[in-house]
């Protein structure tokens, strides 16, 4: 899906720094130079692709460009958060507080958990890496839904774990019965994603509890709630309540989405102390900068405003999804800050149609994920979708 990526073609055709045009074009000297030996890398690297971020939009003359490919919050951080960032942009020569004590205390007070139940990391992505490191190796198995967040196969594959990808239902939901049936003696890690990225539905609290009751106590279950603030469906899973009741559950959350701090890289996990102790041995020391910690804490102090803005984005999402359904599209129940179109083999053509109109969306093969953005951006996507449906699905 990235064969047409301009960055890829540019890097392949540009001379290396410090080389002349003659050497770059294949002079006698460079042609006769011996090839460098290839380092011997782990075979597991051949079993999964690298993570590919959402592409930026193409610049089209006469059109404002919009990036709807990375599930970023199109609203800026709250003014108080921006002021805090300026105040803490002081001396980068000093290490930050490795324990992130002030932020952890703020989270503990807000969430009603103990300090020993929290770890703060450079985004929730680092938590996924750390979780696989403390649970998995080449002798173990990991289970997760698919399609889901693209880092799941990357992080579990990196440690050599056997990956059990359990297909979603036709409605884009977790098939928890199939996931439970996939558990073996070698299973050490199970990942759940609610709302699921990229399809959008949430897990219900009762179905998660029924699932966890089937999971052996020694198997760690991670509940990825990166988008939980946008979810409005009644009966959705209560991650905090579940963690209190299940010692083998770890809750993953982030400041990247609803808080609008994706560029500062702050995530956190809530779990029972033994799990947190293990994670602390695997996370990067001093990973979360002082500025990032301060900004996240300030945003946390404006919790109600953050949730209010997330609610506004959810209303826009619902209206956008409804408009797509009115055009005749099948759209799964969207509960995050994006909408999923299960286009299958036509996903690439739809992405191209958006690119031509200066809109970047995320083509994931089985479908296209469209992040919620500015009203003008969503209106343009609706126009593209309507034309595309006429051209590709109607006689």
Specify the residue positions occupied by each region the protein language model found.
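PLP-dependent aminotransferase-like
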Residues: 134-192
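Short beta-strands and strand-loop turn motifs
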Residues: 163-167, 189-195, 221-225, 332-334, ...
């Amino acid at each position: 899906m990235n064969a047409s990526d301009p960055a890829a073609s540019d890097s392949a055709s540009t001379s290396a720094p410090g080389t002349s045009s003659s050497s770059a074009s294949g002079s006698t000297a460079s042609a006769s130079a011996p090839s460098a030996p290839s380092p011997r890398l782990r075979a597991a690297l051949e079993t999964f692709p690298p993570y590919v971020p959402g592409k930026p939009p193409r610049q089209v003359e006469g059109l404002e460009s919009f990036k709807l490919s990375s599930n970023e919050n199109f609203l800026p951080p709250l003014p108080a958060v921006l002021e805090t960032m300026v105040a803490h942009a002081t001396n980068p020569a000093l290490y930050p507080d490795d324990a992130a004590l002030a932020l952890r205390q703020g989270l503990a007070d807000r969430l009603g958990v103990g300090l020993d139940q929290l770890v703060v990391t450079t985004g929730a992505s680092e938590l996924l890496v750390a979780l696989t490191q403390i649970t998995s190796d080449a002798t173990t198995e990991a289970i997760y839904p698919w399609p889901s967040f693209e880092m799941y196969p990357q992080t579990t594959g990196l440690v050599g774990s056997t990956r059990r990808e359990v297909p979603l239902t036709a409605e884009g939901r977790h098939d928890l019965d199939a996931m439970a049936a996939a558990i073996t003696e070698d299973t050490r890690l199970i990942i759940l994603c609610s709302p699921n990225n990229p399809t959008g539905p949430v897990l219900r609290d009762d179905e998660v509890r029924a699932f966890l009751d089937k999971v052996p106590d020694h198997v760690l279950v991670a509940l990825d709630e990166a988008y939980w603030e946008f979810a409005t469906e009644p009966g959705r899973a209560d991650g905090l309540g579940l963690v209190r009741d299940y010692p083998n559950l770890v809750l993953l959350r982030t400041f990247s989405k609803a808080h609008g701090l994706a560029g500062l890289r702050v995530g956190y996990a809530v779990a029972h102390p033994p799990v947190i102790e293990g994670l602390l041995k695997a996370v990067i020391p001093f990973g979360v900068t002082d500025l990032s910690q301060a900004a996240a804490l300030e945003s946390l102090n404006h919790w109600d405003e953050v949730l209010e803005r997330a609610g506004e984005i959810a209303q826009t999402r619902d209206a956008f999804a409804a408009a797509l359904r009115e055009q005749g599209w099948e759209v799964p129940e969207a509960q995050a800050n994006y909408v999923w179109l299960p286009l299958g083999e036509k996903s690439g053509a739809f992405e191209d149609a958006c690119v031509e109109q200066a809109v970047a969306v995320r083509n994931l093969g089985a479908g296209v994920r469209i992040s919620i953005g500015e009203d003008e951006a969503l209106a343009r996507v609706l126009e593209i979708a309507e034309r595309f449906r006429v051209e590709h699905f109607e006689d």
